[in-house]
């Protein structure tokens, strides 16, 4: 059901919730989790009226806060890990490409059932484009799913692979960076308080030394991180991720890691003294997005370099205070290897293909 005006929304909320001087007061949380919430989600995503769409989103986000559901940055957890105060876990980041409300409900149900720790919902720059899900819409739907399933606590929503297009950058670098800054603005305004900046596409292995190979990567990465720090809401330190090896390309190594982080930190401190840097670093260890399809429809097994993953995670924590290294393309690995990630202190793994496959093949 699409609402025709704001009054219809207020009537539907009678006895359930009321607006009071810009705040939302919940009178009956159980009824809020009923059909009215589903209607609000539908209108928040699809109502042709910007006013009705906006009010529906406001009600959902306000209700989430009232019910103890907080859209958050994972920065504090990553900082604690970087100090060595906690260990032995890996944070999964799940790409929400389709059926977002139903899928996120299933994720929250599973999290409650298993008493899960931290987990992240995310959407990449490319996925925002082809799924037509803007940050403001997706964050609303995720919070609504949390309300529906009775979840309480922090909710982490991430912009994944906010990536520089190398070809476009070569043709007009100012235009390409401006486009990414607009995406960052939209992401932060939409509640993406975790953003992975991917400038690894600018790494040029034809250069004579590792610093020059990584130069465009750390220079543009520092510029975009500075921009995030200038936009982040008061009281929130957005968790920013960096990347040194493009997924599907050459495996990363210690020299690349140190060249990127040393120069990134130096530039950021010079441009914005005291600014928080990145909290984690994505590396390449042998995976590719979506895997390598074989003629029979299966996906080729991946030879993952676990030694590199462990070593670079350790260096990033002990030398730079990061949470550790991040493994992209983890869906391409057999499930019997997943125990290796927390054992090796991997900060996070990104899961997109598996989540999409579940959406296609199973009941939510």
What residue ranges belong to the model's regions?
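Active-site capping/gating regions of soluble enzymes
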Residues: 1-44, 54-73, 180-181, 188, ...
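Alpha/beta catalytic barrel-like cores
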Residues: 1-159, 165-168, 172-176, 182-183, ...
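Short beta-strand segments
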Residues: 122, 158, 198, 241-243, ...
């Amino acid at each position: 059901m699409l609402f025709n005006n704001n009054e219809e929304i207020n009537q539907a909320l009678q006895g359930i919730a009321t607006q009071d001087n810009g705040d939302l007061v919940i009178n009956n949380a159980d009824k809020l989790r009923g059909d009215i919430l589903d209607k609000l989600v539908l209108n928040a995503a699809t109502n042709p009226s910007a006013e009705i769409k906006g009010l529906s989103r406001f009600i959902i986000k306000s209700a989430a806060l009232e019910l103890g559901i907080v859209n958050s940055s994972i920065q504090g957890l990553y900082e604690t890990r970087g100090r060595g105060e906690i260990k032995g876990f890996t944070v999964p980041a799940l790409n929400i490409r389709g059926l977002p409300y139903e899928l996120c409900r299933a994720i929250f149900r599973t999290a409650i059932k298993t008493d899960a720790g931290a987990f992240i919902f995310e959407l990449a720059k490319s996925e925002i484009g082809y799924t037509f899900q803007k940050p403001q819409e997706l964050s609303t739907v995720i919070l609504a799913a949390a309300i529906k399933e009775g979840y309480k606590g922090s909710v982490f929503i991430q912009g994944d692979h906010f990536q520089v297009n190398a070809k476009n950058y070569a043709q007009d670098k100012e235009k390409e960076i401006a486009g990414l800054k607009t995406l960052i603005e939209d992401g932060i305004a939409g509640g993406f308080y975790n953003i992975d900046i991917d400038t690894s596409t600018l790494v040029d292995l034809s250069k004579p030394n590792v610093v020059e190979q990584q130069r465009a990567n750390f220079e543009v990465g520092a510029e975009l991180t500075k921009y995030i720090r200038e936009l982040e809401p008061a009281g929130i330190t957005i968790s920013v991720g960096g990347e040194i090896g493009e997924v599907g390309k050459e495996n990363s190594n210690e020299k690349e890691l140190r060249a990127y982080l040393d120069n990134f930190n130096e530039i950021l401190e010079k441009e914005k003294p005291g600014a928080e840097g990145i909290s984690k670093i994505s590396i390449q260890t042998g995976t590719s997005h979506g895997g390598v399809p074989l003629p029979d429809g299966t996906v080729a097994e991946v030879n993952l370099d676990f030694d590199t993953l462990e070593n670079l995670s350790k260096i990033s924590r002990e030398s730079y205070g990061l949470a550790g290294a991040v493994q992209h393309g983890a869906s391409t690995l057999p499930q019997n290897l997943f125990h290796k990630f927390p054992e090796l202190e991997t900060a996070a793994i990104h899961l997109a293909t598996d989540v999409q496959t579940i959406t296609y093949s199973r009941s939510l």
